[in-house]
Amino acid sequence: MTEYKLVVVGAGGVGKSALTIQLIQNHFVDEYDPTIEDSYRKQVVIDGETCLLDILDTAGQEEYSAMRDQYMRTGEGFLCVFAINNSKSFADINAYREQIKRVKDSDDVPMVLVGNKCDLPSRTVDTKQAQELARSYGIPFIETSAKTRQGVEDAFYTLVREIHQYRMKKLDSSEDNNQGCIRIPCKLM
C-alpha cells in the first residue's frame, strides 16, 4: 500500500479542519475550534490503487507560523485552502506557496488550490480569479464545500494524483541520469 503525506494549509477559519474531517469521518463540523495541529490517516482506493493518506491539518493562525517550516518539510503535497467569502485568505495563498517552495527548496512541489465554502452565497473571490492564480502556478484548482461535501474527495484525490505524477517524474529523471553509467563487473580473488 502506498502512503501519501498530505498537508492542509491556509489562513485561520477557511475550513481546513472541516474539509479534513468531512473526508475522514463523513460529517460536517460547524463550530470553529482553532487547530494547532491534527493528524489523520485514512485508507482509500484512488484509480484502482489502495492508498494510505496521512493528512496533517495545520494551524492557520499567525502565532503558529513558526511550526510551519517543520510540517512543510515532511509533507509531499499541499492543499492550499482559502475561503471564497474571504479575500484576505485568497491573498494569503501566495505567502503559503512561497514558504512551501522555500522550505522544500524547489519550485516543483505538488499542490492543489482549494476554494472552500462554495455553498455560501456571499462570494468575494471570483472563480475566474482563482482559476487564473492556479493556472499561473501550474496547479489544479477545485472548489469545495465541507458542509455539502462538494469537491472534498476530488480535492484530496487530485493532490494524491499530483504527488503520484511527481514521484513518477522523479523516478524517470533518476533513471535517465543512470543511462550514461557503465557497469563493470568485479571479481573477488
Curated annotation (Swiss-Prot):
Alternates between an inactive form bound to GDP and an active form bound to GTP. Activated by a guanine nucleotide-exchange factor (GEF) and inactivated by a GTPase-activating protein (GAP). GO terms for molecular function: G protein activity; GDP binding; GTP binding; GTPase activity. GTP binds at residues 10-17, 57-61, 116-119. InterPro entries: P-loop_NTPase, Small_GTP-bd, Small_GTPase, Small_GTPase_Ras-type. A lipid is attached at C186 (S-farnesyl cysteine). A lipid is attached at C181 (S-palmitoyl cysteine). It comes from the Eukaryota. GO terms for biological process: Ras protein signal transduction. Palmitoylated by the ZDHHC9-GOLGA7 complex. Depalmitoylated by abhd17a, abhd17b and abhd17c. A continuous cycle of de- and re-palmitoylation regulates rapid exchange between plasma membrane and Golgi. Keywords: Cell membrane, Golgi apparatus, GTP-binding, Hydrolase, Lipoprotein, Membrane, Methylation, Nucleotide-binding, Palmitate, Prenylation. Residues 166-185 are annotated as: Hypervariable region. It catalyses: GTP + H2O = GDP + phosphate + H(+). Ras proteins bind GDP/GTP and possess intrinsic GTPase activity. Belongs to the small GTPase superfamily. Ras family. This is GTPase NRas.
